[in-house]
């Protein structure tokens, strides 16, 4: 029997506000435990929440960027459950009346563009954090994170493979980063994803029983966890078993999911409107004000890069996947007006450098201005492309302009045709057998001759001049 996967994602994005959603405590990451707290986020009797307007602005930006309809009237609700990191005994969230609904994203798949629906976006507060002692039966509670603002983005169950889910998730991540409302750090938990996965016989309309997968802290782990769960459920159904509705945790080391608890339904949380918060009313003027603040988003920028710079699809996708990378590329093109040459270096040498060091482009030791200066040296014939790679490596630790590095290390290209011609003649005189073989039809020996000349000049001879003079002499 052939099975089809049905996947929906719930994404929690921690918003980059300086203060929490319902109080003035700092949201800064990494502070000493329980130092960014107050009576409101600790749930002390008599303390009252006050909504942070910046949180609403940020939620509206995400709603507009994902084609959602913003509700003119929404309301906060209490989600009731007990856990040690939830001091009030409930979480303030939104339930029946979220801030935004009915959006979508268009994602790239192997079959072309696919529309993934977004059911809703709602605002809520984060819970605290538990750490467990590995040597003693002790758990510690840090409530610094309690009350940190989140938006939850709930997709429709429109994805059919781990790769579609990953593509959707990466696009959401990019949009949040472009909007500058979330730093997207999955390891620190500011961008978290839960996956609802079920399987059904291909062609069947009715959904199967779903399992919710948690604890996936990278795009790769999201793919692996969903792939495992699809395989687990398919095997179970094929063998006559029954899928249980439950929450499962992903174990990246063992490459499997395992049962955590039975999956709760909405009624288990006893949602009801929060009596301490008035309903949120949003008028058209506010929506248009926020719309005017939206930047160029990833898909729009990618389309512009394809048209304006004539880039290949894969290159445009890579360059626009992060706002900082796209900014770096355009800053370089602004100075050195050869978009494809800049693209080759950014997607090649620069990307390799960033990967090797495990850093982002904002931390690159080579600025866009210095890279543009290096490319200008190649264009002006001061150095060859091969020497440029050596200079690029030097620029990782040397903060000077590339021109100064080239001069100090004596890397200026030999372009004098008379000087190169004498070297060409020396090489040909020293290799009579190879010359005869070349003239006898072994044209691949041209690479051998070029290599010999480059060896004599330590790679500094102008390759175009070398090739031209060699052809003239060998084809006589």
UniProtKB/Swiss-Prot annotation:
Catalysed conversion reaction: L-glutamyl-tRNA(Gln) + L-glutamine + ATP + H2O = L-glutaminyl-tRNA(Gln) + L-glutamate + ADP + phosphate + H(+); L-aspartyl-tRNA(Asn) + L-glutamine + ATP + H2O = L-asparaginyl-tRNA(Asn) + L-glutamate + ADP + phosphate + 2 H(+)
Domain of life: Bacteria
Database matches in Pfam families: GatB_N (PF02934), GatB_Yqey (PF02637)
Annotated GO biological process: glutaminyl-tRNAGln biosynthesis via transamidation; translation
Xref: InterPro entries: Asn/Gln-tRNA_amidoTrfase_suB/E, Asn/Gln-tRNA_Trfase_suB/E_cat, Asn/Gln_amidotransferase, Asn/Gln_tRNA_amidoTrase-B-like, GatB, GatB_C_1, GatB_Yqey_C_2, Gln-tRNA_amidoTrfase_suB_CS
EC number: 6.3.5.-
Regions that span the bilayer: none
Keywords annotated in UniProt: ATP-binding, Ligase, Nucleotide-binding, Protein biosynthesis
GO molecular function: asparaginyl-tRNA synthase (glutamine-hydrolyzing) activity; ATP binding; glutaminyl-tRNA synthase (glutamine-hydrolyzing) activity
Family named by the database record: Belongs to the GatB/GatE family. GatB subfamily.
Protein role: Allows the formation of correctly charged Asn-tRNA(Asn) or Gln-tRNA(Gln) through the transamidation of misacylated Asp-tRNA(Asn) or Glu-tRNA(Gln) in organisms which lack either or both of asparaginyl-tRNA or glutaminyl-tRNA synthetases. The reaction takes place in the presence of glutamine and ATP through an activated phospho-Asp-tRNA(Asn) or phospho-Glu-tRNA(Gln).
Subunit structure as annotated in this protein's UniProt entry: Heterotrimer of A, B and C subunits.
The protein, known as: Aspartyl/glutamyl-tRNA(Asn/Gln) amidotransferase subunit B
Gene behind the chain: gatB
């Amino acid at each position: 029997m052939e099975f089809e996967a049905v996947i929906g994602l719930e994404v929690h994005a921690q918003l980059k506000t300086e203060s929490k959603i319902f109080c003035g405590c700092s949201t800064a990451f990494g502070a000493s435990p329980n130092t960014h707290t107050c009576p409101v986020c600790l749930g002390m009797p008599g303390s009252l929440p006050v909504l942070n307007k910046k949180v609403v602005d940020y939620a509206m930006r995400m709603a507009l960027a994902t084609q959602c309809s913003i509700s003119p009237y929404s309301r906060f609700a209490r989600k009731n459950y007990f856990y040690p990191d939830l001091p009030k005994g409930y979480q303030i969230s939104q339930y029946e009346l979220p801030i935004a609904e009915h959006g979508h994203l268009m994602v790239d798949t192997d079959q072309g563009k696919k529309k993934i629906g977004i059911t809703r976006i709602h605002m809520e507060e984060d819970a605290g954090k538990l750490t467990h002692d590995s040597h003693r039966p002790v758990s510690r509670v840090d409530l610094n994170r309690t009350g940190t603002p989140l938006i939850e983005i709930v997709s429709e169950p429109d994805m059919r493979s781990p790769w579609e889910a990953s593509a959707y998730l990466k696009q959401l991540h990019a949009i949040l980063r472009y909007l500058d409302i979330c730093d997207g750090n999955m390891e620190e938990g500011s961008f978290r994803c839960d996956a609802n996965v079920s399987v059904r016989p291909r062609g069947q309309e009715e959904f199967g029983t779903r399992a919710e997968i948690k604890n996936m802290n990278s795009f790769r782990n999201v793919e692996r966890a969903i792939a495992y769960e699809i395989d687990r459920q398919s095997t179970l159904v094929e063998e006559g078993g029954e899928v249980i509705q439950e929450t499962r945790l992903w174990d990246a080391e063992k490459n499997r999911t395992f049962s955590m608890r039975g999956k709760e339904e909405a009624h288990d949380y006893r949602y009801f409107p929060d009596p301490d918060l008035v309903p949120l009313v949003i008028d058209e003027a506010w929506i248009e004000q926020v719309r005017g603040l939206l930047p160029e988003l990833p898909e729009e920028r990618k389309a512009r890069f394809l048209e304006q710079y004539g880039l290949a699809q894969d290159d445009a996708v890579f360059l626009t996947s992060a706002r900082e990378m796209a900014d770096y590329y355009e800053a370089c093109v602004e100075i050195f007006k050869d978009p494809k040459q800049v693209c080759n270096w950014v997607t090649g040498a620069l990307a390799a450098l960033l990967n090797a060091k495990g850093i982002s482009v904002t931390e690159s030791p080579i600025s866009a201005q210095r890279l543009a200066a290096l490319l200008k040296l190649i264009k002006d014939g001061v150095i060859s492309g091969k020497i440029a790679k050596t200079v690029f490596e030097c620029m990782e630790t040397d903060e000077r302009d590339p021109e100064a590095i080239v001069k100090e290390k004596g890397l200026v290209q030999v372009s004098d045709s008379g000087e190169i011609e004498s070297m060409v003649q020396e090489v040909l005189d020293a290799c009579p057998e190879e010359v005869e073989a070349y003239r006898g039809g072994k044209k691949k020996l041209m690479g051998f001759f070029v290599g010999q000349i480059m060896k004599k000049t330590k790679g500094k001879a102008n390759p175009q001049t070398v090739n031209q003079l060699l052809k003239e002499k060998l084809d006589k």
